[in-house]
């Protein structure tokens, strides 16, 4: 045996002793790596096998999961029973799950929130009707089949397809067939199964005294809600096309769209004739375009709803009413007792004027009090007299306004807004206005006060330059048109409100004035607008009046406005309105321009509310007479008579009305009554202390366009 050879026992001993230990460890490590690779490969293969096939169609998301899948948060399908329930053996109990209600749906029944619209849809009205029919019918009498809740959206024939009776008079200028579009309150329902269609069988005789089939129905049928939102036929909404998962959401969306699109389709007629009213016995009447505005609701033609359309309110059986379409028109409304009822939003009145106090709206408690007018139209829609005498139910009526009694002459516009765009040919010369304002301020105010006003105007001068440097002549003309159009709109508000109001340009020139402001200050409208000469000598001095002896602060009245010419168009005279600075005392003028500098290009919706002192309009003759009366009062000669004489002078300044001194009432302290009392404010010192609020309105170029000011005297 070779010395290098070993026996098997020796090899085993060497292995035990560790001589071959490194080779064994390397072998074990190699096996572990191979096993790890195999496990990773198996996992990768399993993951690839479990991955979705990219070529298979994408699963469509289910609109609503079933109850079992909803509880288990599993993916469900639209079919019922779903595949998961079939695999688990729950196919008999597979039904749609109920979602968590939103806050605005807490009062809605669960049946309404179920997906889909079918014949078994929950309906309060039909549920109550079925209960009543089931209790009132005997087992031996066959019951009439009730129509399902799902109504077809097929449009019914138009109104003009109904035949007319020859004994009914009809004016060709009125009626829905002459409208360009359908009324917004016009849900078209199909005629019921039990009602004959007059279009399909026009030759069938129809009695004028025939009442709808719902006339003999039990009152319990009409105890449900007046507006049933669960009816899918409401205004013929196609809920399937709206692709809503929620039934209530689809109805809400459809109703909003109906109101938004239906309001603009109202026929162009008098606003009073379009108002829907609830006439006698709850009949919904809608005046036609040709109806007289003074026509009472009982004489107006029922346009859409008949008496059966209001049974939810009156709780009485309907009464037949002959309409413009003859007796056959009752067939349309005869089957509407089990249909939803709704009204569209009507348009607002065309003017802001209110009727007289004796023509105010009232709640008429007796339908017999409706006044019949001789010019109510060529047709009549009065109910049967024998039936109307049996029941006199309280009804709600629209205001019975007579057209001839509407006193709107003082507030009615005499011109059209389009005339503004035709009359404005040249831009307004704001440069001349600012030059005139600067000259007036230098003449009236002291150098210190003039400097404060100049600093305020200088702070906004760069903004004016920056906003107007890119404007050409056409832009300036357009700016003046915008100003005149806005001023035209403000005239109604000034006349409607009783607050002393003035509107002036950004230069401070008066552009509009209310009657109350003239009564308060004595400044006539023609003088403020520059149409008549300004002879005011009151500049708010210590005595309130300026005499010839005063040197500083005196102001020479401007000549007649026709002598002042526009620098841009010297051929035509330029009227010079009164400046706002002429209406306020010195401190109020300075405070106004300092506030104007902050608000002109600041907050576009901001306003300033503070106090001021308005200057009364005083001429030199008034100052001489008042100075003489004051001298007599100081001398102790008939002071009371001089005070009465001063009050007498006050009665003839704003409106030109004179007051007799003997019949003049002596007002007590704090007493104000009528125009005379308003004129008496501030007459002694020529100043009226007021609280006023003003704001700046800008034009389309973001430039201050006009200033609106409201005054209230401090009494």
UniProtKB/Swiss-Prot annotation:
Task: Kindly indicate which segments of the sequence are annotated as binding DNA.
Answer: 66-94
The record, for SMART domains, names:
GAL4
Q: Which PROSITE patterns match?
A: ZN2_CY6_FUNGAL_2
**Where is it localised?**
Nucleus
Q: Spans of biased composition, class Low complexity?
A: 386-400, 650-662
Question: Of which family is this protein a member?
Answer: Belongs to the ERT1/acuK family.
Q: What is this protein called?
A: Transcription activator of gluconeogenesis MGYG_02011
- The organism of origin for this protein: Arthroderma gypseum (strain ATCC MYA-4604 / CBS 118893) (Microsporum gypseum)
């Amino acid at each position: 045996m070779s010395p290098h050879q070993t026996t098997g026992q020796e090899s085993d001993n060497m292995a035990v002793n560790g001589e071959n230990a490194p080779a064994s460890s390397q072998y074990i490590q190699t096996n572990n790596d191979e096993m790890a690779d195999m496990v990773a490969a198996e996992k990768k293969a399993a993951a690839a096998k479990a991955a979705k096939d990219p070529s298979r169609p994408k699963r469509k998301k289910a609109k609503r999961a079933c109850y079992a899948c909803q509880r288990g948060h599993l993916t469900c399908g639209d079919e019922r029973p779903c595949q998961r329930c079939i695999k688990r053996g729950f196919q008999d109990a597979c039904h749609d799950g109920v979602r968590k209600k939103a806050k605005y749906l807490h009062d809605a029944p669960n049946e309404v929130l179920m997906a889909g619209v079918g014949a078994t849809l929950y309906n309060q009205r039909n549920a109550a009707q079925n209960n009543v029919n089931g209790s009132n019918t005997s087992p031996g009498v066959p019951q009439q089949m009730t129509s399902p809740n799902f109504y077809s959206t097929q449009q019914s024939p138009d109104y003009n397809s109904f035949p007319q009776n020859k004994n009914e008079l009809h004016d060709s200028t009125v009626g829905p067939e002459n409208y360009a579009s359908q009324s917004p309150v016009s849900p078209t329902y199909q005629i019921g199964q039990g009602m004959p269609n007059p279009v399909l069988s026009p030759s069938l005789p129809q009695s004028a005294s025939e009442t709808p089939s719902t006339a003999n129905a039990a009152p319990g049928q009409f105890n449900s809600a007046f507006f049933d939102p669960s009816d899918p036929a409401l205004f013929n909404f196609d809920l399937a096309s709206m692709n809503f998962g929620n039934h209530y959401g689809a109805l809400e969306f459809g109703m909003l769209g109906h109101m938004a699109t239906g309001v603009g389709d109202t026929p162009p007629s008098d606003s009073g004739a379009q108002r829907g009213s609830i006439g006698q016995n709850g009949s919904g009447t809608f005046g036609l375009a040709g109806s007289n505005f003074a026509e009472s609701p009982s004489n107006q033609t029922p346009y859409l709803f008949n008496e059966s359309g209001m049974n939810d309110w009156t709780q009485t059986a309907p009464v037949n009413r002959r309409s413009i379409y003859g007796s056959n028109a009752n067939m349309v409304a005869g089957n509407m007792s089990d249909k939803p009822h709704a009204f569209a939003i009507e348009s607002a009145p065309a003017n802001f004027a209110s009727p007289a106090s004796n023509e105010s709206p009232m709640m008429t408690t007796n339908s017999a009090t409706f006044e019949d007018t001789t010019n109510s139209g060529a047709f009549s829609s009065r109910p049967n007299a024998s039936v109307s005498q049996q029941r006199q139910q309280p009804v709600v009526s629209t205001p019975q306004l007579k057209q001839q009694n509407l006193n709107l002459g003082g507030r009615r516009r005499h011109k059209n807004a389009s005339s503004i765009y035709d009359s404005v040919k040249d831009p307004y010369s704001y440069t001349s206005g600012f030059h005139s304002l600067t000259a007036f301020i230098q003449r009236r105010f002291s150098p210190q006060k003039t400097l404060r006003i100049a600093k305020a105007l200088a702070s906004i001068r760069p903004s004016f330059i920056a906003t107007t440097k890119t404007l050409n002549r056409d832009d300036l003309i357009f700016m003046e048109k915008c100003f005149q159009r806005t001023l035209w709109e403000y005239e109604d508000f000034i006349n409607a409100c009783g607050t002393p109001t003035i509107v002036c340009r950004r230069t401070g020139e008066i552009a509009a004035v209310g009657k109350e402001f003239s009564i308060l200050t004595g400044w006539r409208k023609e003088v403020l607008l520059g149409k008549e000469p300004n002879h005011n000598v009151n500049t708010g001095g210590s005595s309130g009046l300026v005499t010839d002896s005063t040197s500083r602060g005196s102001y020479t009245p401007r000549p007649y406005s026709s002598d002042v010419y526009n620098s841009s168009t010297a051929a035509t005279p330029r009227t010079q309105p009164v400046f706002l600075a002429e209406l306020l005392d010195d401190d109020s003028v300075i405070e106004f321009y300092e506030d104007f500098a902050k608000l002109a290009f600041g907050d576009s919706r901001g306003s300033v509310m503070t106090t001021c002192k308005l200057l009364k309009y005083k001429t030199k003759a008034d100052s001489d007479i008042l100075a003489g009366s004051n001298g007599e009062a100081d001398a102790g000669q008939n002071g009371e008579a001089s005070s009465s004489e001063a009050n007498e002078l006050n009665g003839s300044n704003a409106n030109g009305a004179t007051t007799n001194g003997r019949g003049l009432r002596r007002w007590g302290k704090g007493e104000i009554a009528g125009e005379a009392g308003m004129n008496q404010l501030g007459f002694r010192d020529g100043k009226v202390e007021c609280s006023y609020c003003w704001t700046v309105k800008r034009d389309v170029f973001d430039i201050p366009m006009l200033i609106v000011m409201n005054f209230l005297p401090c009494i």
